[in-house]
């Protein structure tokens, strides 16, 4: 901005001193004429020339990095539990990514989900064995945070995927989709499935402390505050710990305890499959519907017969691939894990860059909706 300078002209009045001669009978003294005061030289006021200074941009555009990896060493994958079709599909993507970016992946996790502390020994073992990176889906965000922090202190790159821990305990969190969007989708599926968006609904979740499921359920509850969902009544939230037998038992209990139940919403692929099997076996198709997050191959038959009118999920293989690529980028030093960094992972996201956002999070993309119109094609195209 240019400064405006005001000019002031300096005016100086010159006063002439006149000597008067006085007549007197006494001798008149001789008075030397007064010397006129000199006229001061006033320097002209000069308006300075102000050169505008270009404003620096708020932030310099960071270079977009294409991750190449080329790493060696061990990368340990720690899902919530083993034998889970969802994480098995993710591990397919991880193995595929290892051929592109280097490193040797392996899985180590509890046999059963639901225990907040069960992952800690696996994190500690990977740290002791000097793994280059660990990929963790948190069963409990708080319980494992100290073990993750200790791993970072030993130089292990910590990548969370699917379910997050506490900020500061990891390098990057690879989130499968926007949390608010998933919650909104669950609420909308319940509304679409319940008769005229009215009636009793219940939630069958994974573990009570599961970070991602709890966040989605909270987002669903927030969405349902809208008057559009006023006719829906949430009567229960139960937990199957992502174990088929536990989830089946919980679905049976829900139906027995709530004879007017219209929809079971399950934000877990294990739970949604178990609930669909229970509804089908009890011949309640058309009376109790099941919606939630499910894999296309497992849910195809239940979508086609009307047990589960629609479910949604992201490409779990791509989720695993992206998580491993991020780990490789951190190990190689191609990315640092700072907010604002942009990078490209070849073969996914259409070549568009991912940007690290708040809490060091990146998002895989939008979920896929599976229904009668598209389930056959998705089940054919997607190997999970």
What are these regions (language model features)?
Residues 18-21:
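C-terminal motif of bacterial Sec signal peptides marking the signal peptidase cleavage site
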Residues 4, 23-384:
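A residue-level marker of the well-folded mature domains of exported/periplasmic proteins
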Residues 1-12:
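Bacterial N-terminal signal peptides that target proteins for export
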């Amino acid at each position: 901005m240019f400064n405006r300078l005001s000019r002031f002209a300096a005016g100086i009045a010159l006063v002439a001193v006149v000597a008067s001669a006085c007549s007197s009978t006494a001798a008149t003294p001789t008075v030397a004429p007064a010397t006129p005061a000199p006229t001061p030289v006033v320097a002209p006021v000069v308006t300075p020339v102000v050169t505008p200074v270009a404003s620096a941009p708020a932030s310099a555009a960071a270079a977009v990095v294409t991750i190449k990896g080329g790493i060696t060493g061990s990368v340990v994958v720690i899902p919530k539990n083993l034998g889970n079709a969802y994480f098995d599909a993710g591990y397919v993507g991880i193995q595929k990514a290892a051929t592109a970016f280097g490193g040797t992946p392996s899985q180590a996790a509890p046999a059963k989900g639901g225990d907040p502390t069960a992952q800690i020994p696996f994190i500690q073992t990977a740290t002791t064995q000097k793994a280059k990176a660990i990929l963790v889906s948190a069963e409990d965000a708080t319980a494992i945070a100290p073990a993750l922090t200790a791993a970072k202190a030993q130089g292990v790159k910590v990548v969370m995927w699917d379910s997050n821990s506490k900020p500061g305990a990891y390098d990057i969190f690879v989130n499968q989709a926007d949390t608010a969007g998933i919650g909104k989708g669950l609420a909308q599926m319940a509304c679409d499935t319940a008769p005229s968006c009215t009636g009793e609904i219940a939630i069958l979740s994974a573990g009570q402390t599961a970070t991602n499921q709890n966040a989605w359920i909270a987002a669903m509850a927030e969405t349902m505050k809208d008057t559009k969902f006023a006719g829906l009544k949430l009567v229960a939230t139960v937990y199957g710990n992502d174990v088929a037998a536990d989830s089946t038992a919980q679905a049976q209990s829900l139906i027995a305890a709530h004879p007017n139940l219209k929809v079971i919403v399950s934000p877990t692929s294990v739970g949604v499959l178990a609930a669909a099997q229970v509804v089908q076996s009890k011949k309640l198709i058309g009376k109790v519907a099941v919606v939630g997050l499910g894999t296309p191959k497992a849910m195809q038959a239940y979508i086609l017969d009307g047990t589960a009118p629609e479910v949604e999920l992201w490409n779990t293989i791509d989720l695993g691939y992206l998580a491993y690529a991020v780990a490789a980028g951190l190990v190689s030093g191609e990315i640092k894990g700072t907010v604002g960094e942009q990078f490209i992972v070849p073969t996914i996201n259409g070549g568009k860059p991912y940007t690290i956002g708040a809490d060091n999070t990146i998002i895989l993309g939008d979920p896929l909706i599976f229904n009668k119109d598209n389930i056959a094609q998705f089940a054919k195209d997607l190997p999970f």
